[in-house]
Amino acid sequence: MKDLVAKRYVKALIDGRNSESINTISNKLNQVASAFADERFNSIISSPEISDKSKVDLIISFVDGTDNSLNNFIKLLGEKRRLDLLPFIAKDLNIQLAKMNNNYIGVVYTNQELSSDYISSIEKQFSKKFDVKLSLSQNVCDYDGIKVDIDGLGVEISFSKDRLKSQLIDHILKAV
C-alpha cells in the first residue's frame, strides 16, 4: 500500500524537472532514507509525543542546502503524517531515475563464486541485447544453476540443472 502512495509522490517530484535536479533530489532523499535504518530515528518519527513540526525540522536538517521545493515536499509529508513514506519514495525515485538514464542494476544468483570477467561478459551481452547500461552484482546462494534477475526491466533468465535433467528425461521417454 505504501508503495502505491509513494509512486504518486514520485510522479509529482519528477514532473517538470530536468534530470539533474531529479538526481539532486534523489541523493538528498537517499540520505534521509538511510536514517530510517536507525531504530532510534524510527522511534522519533513514529512517536505521537513529538510534534509533527519537530519531526519535519529534524528531516529538513538532513537536507539543508537544497531548494525550497524539497523542503516544501517534506513539510507536506509532515502535514499529511506520511513521513514514514520517505524510504519508499527514495527507492521509487531511484528506479524512475534509472529508467530515465537507461541504467539498470541486476543480480546474478549462483551456488558458487563466478569470476569478475564472467560477470562483466554477462553484463556486456545483456547490455547489448536490451540496449541499456547494466551493472550486475553476484549473490552466492543455494540455487543449483544460474539466474540473472534485472528488476527494473522485469527480466529474469535462469538455467537450472534440475530443470534440464527433467526435460532431458521427458524427451527420452517421448522418444521411446
Swiss-Prot record:
Q: ATP-binding: is it a keyword of this entry?
A: no
Cell cycle keyword on record: no
**Gene Ontology molecular-function annotations:** proton-transporting ATP synthase activity, rotational mechanism
Keyword vocabulary terms for this entry? ATP synthesis, Cell inner membrane, Cell membrane, CF(1), Hydrogen ion transport, Ion transport, Membrane, Transport
Compartments (UniProt record): Cell inner membrane
Q: Which InterPro entries match?
A: ATP_synth_OSCP/delta_N_sf, ATPase_OSCP/dsu
How does the protein's chain sit in the membrane according to the entry?
Peripheral membrane protein
Classification via Pfam families: OSCP
Alphabetical GO CC annotations of the entry are: plasma membrane; proton-transporting ATP synthase complex
Q: What does this protein do?
A: F(1)F(0) ATP synthase produces ATP from ADP in the presence of a proton or sodium gradient. F-type ATPases consist of two structural domains, F(1) containing the extramembraneous catalytic core and F(0) containing the membrane proton channel, linked together by a central stalk and a peripheral stalk. During catalysis, ATP synthesis in the catalytic domain of F(1) is coupled via a rotary mechanism of the central stalk subunits to proton translocation.
UniProt lists the family membership as follows: Belongs to the ATPase delta chain family.
What does the annotation say about its assembly with partners? Answer: F-type ATPases have 2 components, F(1) - the catalytic core - and F(0) - the membrane proton channel. F(1) has five subunits: alpha(3), beta(3), gamma(1), delta(1), epsilon(1). F(0) has three main subunits: a(1), b(2) and c(10-14). The alpha and beta chains form an alternating ring which encloses part of the gamma chain. F(1) is attached to F(0) by a central stalk formed by the gamma and epsilon chains, while a peripheral stalk is formed by the delta and b chains.
State the name under which the record lists this protein. ATP synthase subunit delta
What species is given as this protein's source?
Answer: Aliarcobacter butzleri (strain RM4018)
